[in-house]
């Protein structure tokens, strides 16, 4: 397995994401610049948090036109695993791989804290190592994480079990129905505002994010009939 971490001008969580893949998954991982146009050798593509292009216009609005995004869409259509975290989630909605939009936090303030999430769907490539209904702790760091969609889209998300994570307890940004992360209908594209890559070691206060990366690896191994030996 080989993983790509896309780097846009203004990305700032790319190193954290790269290190999480190396530390937890133990597979080859590369930084891929936003102007690159070939992702064919990668099995999973990760879009990190940050402030791509300074968040001008709105979060992700400029990054969605980066040359690499055409290849990200192609990879998603091919069934490869795509995960967007924070700004990466915003970019995935802007490019149309995920429905809805991320608005300014209801408080109009940047929120940076450890948040509790409830796992709504553990039957995905990204959450299979969690239990359904489990409450986990993952940090957030965003000013525009207020998820919104229209009623028809929300009904589809619920019917198709595309709501993967909800905030548990405090809703830090006013997100519709406490939504913290969603996937596409096919289940190979996930977007979430919290940062699992910042919760992969016990010294990080929480290591609950670790299981997202083990889930991705386990999914790829099963899809490619790869066996491991103790």
From Swiss-Prot:
Database matches in HAMAP family: PurQ
KW Transit peptide (keyword) present: no
GO process terms (BP): 'de novo' IMP biosynthetic process
Name of this chain's protein: Phosphoribosylformylglycinamidine synthase subunit PurQ
InterPro entries, per the entry: Class_I_gatase-like, PRibForGlyAmidine_synth_PurQ
Residues of the Glutamine amidotransferase type-1 domain: 2-226
EC number: 6.3.5.3, 3.5.1.2
GO-annotated molecular function: ATP binding; glutaminase activity; phosphoribosylformylglycinamidine synthase activity
PROSITE patterns: GATASE_TYPE_1
Biological role: Part of the phosphoribosylformylglycinamidine synthase complex involved in the purines biosynthetic pathway. Catalyzes the ATP-dependent conversion of formylglycinamide ribonucleotide (FGAR) and glutamine to yield formylglycinamidine ribonucleotide (FGAM) and glutamate. The FGAM synthase complex is composed of three subunits. PurQ produces an ammonia molecule by converting glutamine to glutamate. PurL transfers the ammonia molecule to FGAR to form FGAM in an ATP-dependent manner.
GO cellular component: cytoplasm
Pfam families: GATase_5
Subunit structure: Part of the FGAM synthase complex composed of 1 PurL, 1 PurQ and 2 PurS subunits.
Reactions accelerated catalytically: N(2)-formyl-N(1)-(5-phospho-beta-D-ribosyl)glycinamide + L-glutamine + ATP + H2O = 2-formamido-N(1)-(5-O-phospho-beta-D-ribosyl)acetamidine + L-glutamate + ADP + phosphate + H(+); L-glutamine + H2O = L-glutamate + NH4(+)
Stretches assigned to coiled coil: none
Compartments where located: Cytoplasm
Entries under Gene3D superfamilies matching the protein: 3.40.50.880
Pathway assigned in UniProt: Purine metabolism; IMP biosynthesis via de novo pathway; 5-amino-1-(5-phospho-D-ribosyl)imidazole from N(2)-formyl-N(1)-(5-phospho-D-ribosyl)glycinamide: step 1/2
Principal localisation: cytoplasm
